Amino acid sequence: MTIAVGRAPSRGWFDVLDDWLKRDRFVFVGWSGILLFPCAFLALGGWLTGTTFVTSWYTHGLASSYLEGANFLTVAVSSPADSMGHSLLLLWGPEAQGDFTRWCQLGGLWPFVALHGAFGLIGFMLRQFEIARLVGIRPYNALAFSAPIAVFVSVFLMYPLGQSSWFFAPSFGVAAIFRFLLFLQGFHNWTLNPFHMMGVAGVLGGALLCAIHGATVENTLFEDGEGANTFRAFNPTQSEETYSMVTANRFWSQIFGIAFSNKRWLHFFMLFVPVTGLWMSAVGIVGLALNLRAYDFVSQELRAAEDPEFETFYTKNILLNEGIRAWMAPQDQPHEKFVFPEEVLPRGNAL
């Protein structure tokens, strides 16, 4: 009789690491976690450090930290000075030369937070893709999350790369983002840009669809008893459907004369509207980075210049944009030492 003794195949370090990363634990790590967790930690830590201690005096001539008296709405990690160009401002680079204090003064925390934040968001998207594959579902969550990533990358990275320096990127703070919005309007007439319109339609349309869908499901929950509440419908172990798609279809058919006939098309539409809107707005921001113009109704501007009694909402907005540029530029870019004489400041046709 012959006895064959089997030997377990040897496992390499990659297999061991793969098993450890994908082990079932309270917080899943995975291969995506190698990118996500360090980058998210460093981005958040850099932002908290900057908003707590670091001034923007040397980059924007502003106070921007809790230490200087700013509050949650006015603190920011500000973008570097215009003179820094598109330098990555590495701590060990020629600008800071390993001096941490000088690095903070030059605005080194901004590219640190921006790049680690971008890679952290990408890591989170890859995390959704990885877990979806392990669980055995489609990766549409990752696809949906690509939309805010596209907006972040286009606004914080692509736009300033198309301009003269990182200075023109938004700083990381609430009031700083508002300043950036005013800048986009004044210098690019962003609200009249069709890509911005598609973005607004996507975000508000997605919110509307979400509200309508949630209300419709609540309205058509199957009744569990005589009571007014139907909380047993939230039991995750129930085998039957929670709500009636047929009843919902009948309701909206009576409201609009048309309704979604199946859940797949309904939920795909809820995915498509906001994701497409955000992607289109990201494309529009890349266009602004290249200083592309959108709608210019020159005929209206020429007629308004010739006829003091002719003015449209478009020509009024053009005057407002001129005002933003004229009054914002000296405050926003003090290093340029702009001086605008009174006669070139914008005046409305009625003045």
Swiss-Prot record:
Residues noted as binding pheophytin a in the record, renumbered to the chain: 128, 141
Binding site for Fe cation: 213, 267
Annotated compartments: Cellular thylakoid membrane
EC number: 1.10.3.9
Reactions listed under catalytic activity: 2 a plastoquinone + 4 hnu + 2 H2O = 2 a plastoquinol + O2
One cellular component (GO) term of this entry: photosystem II
Binding site for chlorophyll a PD2: 196
Chief location category: membrane
Cofactor stoichiometry and binding remark: The D1/D2 heterodimer binds P680, chlorophylls that are the primary electron donor of PSII, and subsequent electron acceptors. It shares a non-heme iron and each subunit binds pheophytin, quinone, additional chlorophylls, carotenoids and lipids. There is also a Cl(-1) ion associated with D1 and D2, which is required for oxygen evolution. The PSII complex binds additional chlorophylls, carotenoids and specific lipids.
Binding site for chlorophyll a ChlzD2: 116
Binding site for a plastoquinone: 213, 260
Keyword Magnesium: yes
Top-level taxon in the UniProt lineage: Bacteria
Topology term for the membrane: Multi-pass membrane protein
Keyword terms: Chlorophyll, Chromophore, Electron transport, Iron, Magnesium, Membrane, Metal-binding, Oxidoreductase, Photosynthesis, Photosystem II, Thylakoid, Transmembrane, Transmembrane helix, Transport
Molecular function GO terms recorded: chlorophyll binding; electron transporter, transferring electrons within the cyclic electron transport pathway of photosynthesis activity; iron ion binding; oxygen evolving activity
Pfam families: Photo_RC
Complex and partners: PSII is composed of 1 copy each of membrane proteins PsbA, PsbB, PsbC, PsbD, PsbE, PsbF, PsbH, PsbI, PsbJ, PsbK, PsbL, PsbM, PsbT, PsbX, PsbY, PsbZ, Psb30/Ycf12, peripheral proteins PsbO, CyanoQ (PsbQ), PsbU, PsbV and a large number of cofactors. It forms dimeric complexes.
Family as reported in the entry's similarity comment: Belongs to the reaction center PufL/M/PsbA/D family.
Functional description taken from the UniProt entry: Photosystem II (PSII) is a light-driven water:plastoquinone oxidoreductase that uses light energy to abstract electrons from H(2)O, generating O(2) and a proton gradient subsequently used for ATP formation. It consists of a core antenna complex that captures photons, and an electron transfer chain that converts photonic excitation into a charge separation. The D1/D2 (PsbA/PsbD) reaction center heterodimer binds P680, the primary electron donor of PSII as well as several subsequent electron acceptors. D2 is needed for assembly of a stable PSII complex.
NCBIfam families associated with the record: psbD
Further facts: 2 of the reaction center chlorophylls (ChlD1 and ChlD2) are entirely coordinated by water.
Protein name: Photosystem II D2 protein
Organism the protein comes from: Trichormus variabilis (strain ATCC 29413 / PCC 7937)
